[in-house]
């Protein structure tokens, strides 16, 4: 008789894990504590809620995130199917309407005959075949039990969400529509700054007052979602080479590159909401209004949501995990998602896909499998389980963790495309060999 699987948490990783398990013909009990109990970062009860940006990053095969998406599509990923269906214009990136996207994921799982949804908080690791995908905001009780199980303290860092503005409140005479280097369709609103405007803004930003941290939080940040004020504290040049870099964003009205540019990205399908790209923040709300209104075109901006900041936790995976996403101590227990040390929406969902498929195999009496290291999913699983225990940090999908090609290709784009083509070939063969 085929065993059933518990999946704890219906975020990106948990939703994907449950979907993959169910599609293998295995019964799933999907536990989600919302809406009975909310986290500091979630705003609704839908599954797979995007709590930071609405962008799933690049969609091209010359980019590691684009390759990861394509690998997931090979396995009929619920996250990728829903993202593709509810995409909004974002140049060469894949961005989604966050409301309709998460609603689609929720409805698909509710309607799957092999999925049972249970709305309750789990405060200790269950017995039996289980995938824990409770994410960076794992409840205190469960986090305590996980720490007891792993025998190691969790590491802490922060994710920070950018403000969302009403497009109708922006001064369209001061901003212009363009994607960097004109890649894809012109999907970003760009607010150009002169040198004086930039330094006036910068000087106010570094003086702005931040919200008080909780006593369990410290000042560790992950580079991928660093607050804008923390970037500014490292110097003006850090901003000019980071989120405010003007390269490839010539102002069509002058034909010249501005001194600095703030980009705004469409946040919903209707196109009436925009978020400020790279402006995740922990500033007090009044300070956000004051300082961000100094950006040209945003003088009278209406904030639909101010930026917020919240704690994240992740395991020391090289010490705790195997490349199958099983734990070393208990082979019927899997972890998936950001708490394993993969960083990013797509990476989290991909780890859920990987863990879910292996949990389904065990439920069917089969051995778990390790994805080929030439694939991005396989490379990430290998990295998080073989990295230095002492210096382990979260990681995004990147070509640096994938084995090199045998042939030497100087052109970076051509090389990346060749790596992606090899990965897609490997993953299709791997799927045909191991999964129905």
Swiss-Prot record:
Cofactor(s) essential for the protein: FAD
Gene Ontology, cellular component aspect: cytosol
GO molecular function annotation: flavin adenine dinucleotide binding; tRNA (uracil(54)-C5)-methyltransferase activity, 5,10-methylenetetrahydrofolate-dependent
One BP term from GO: tRNA wobble uridine modification
Disulphide bonds in the chain: none
InterPro entries assigned: FAD/NAD-bd_sf, MnmG-rel, MnmG_N, TrmFO
EC number in record: 2.1.1.74
Protein localization: Cytoplasm
Chief site of localization: cytoplasm
Reactions catalysed, as given in the entry: uridine(54) in tRNA + (6R)-5,10-methylene-5,6,7,8-tetrahydrofolate + NADH + H(+) = 5-methyluridine(54) in tRNA + (6S)-5,6,7,8-tetrahydrofolate + NAD(+); uridine(54) in tRNA + (6R)-5,10-methylene-5,6,7,8-tetrahydrofolate + NADPH + H(+) = 5-methyluridine(54) in tRNA + (6S)-5,6,7,8-tetrahydrofolate + NADP(+)
Binding site for FAD: 9-14
Record bears the keyword NAD: yes
Keyword Transferase assigned: yes
Superkingdom, taxonomy of origin: Bacteria
Keywords carried by this UniProt record: Cytoplasm, FAD, Flavoprotein, Methyltransferase, NAD, NADP, Transferase, tRNA processing
Family assignment from sequence similarity: Belongs to the MnmG family. TrmFO subfamily.
Known role: Catalyzes the folate-dependent formation of 5-methyl-uridine at position 54 (M-5-U54) in all tRNAs.
Xref: PANTHER family: GLUCOSE INHIBITED DIVISION PROTEIN A, METHYLENETETRAHYDROFOLATE--TRNA-(URACIL-5-)-METHYLTRANSFERASE TRMFO
Name of the protein in question: Methylenetetrahydrofolate--tRNA-(uracil-5-)-methyltransferase TrmFO
Organism of this sequence: Ligilactobacillus salivarius (strain UCC118) (Lactobacillus salivarius)
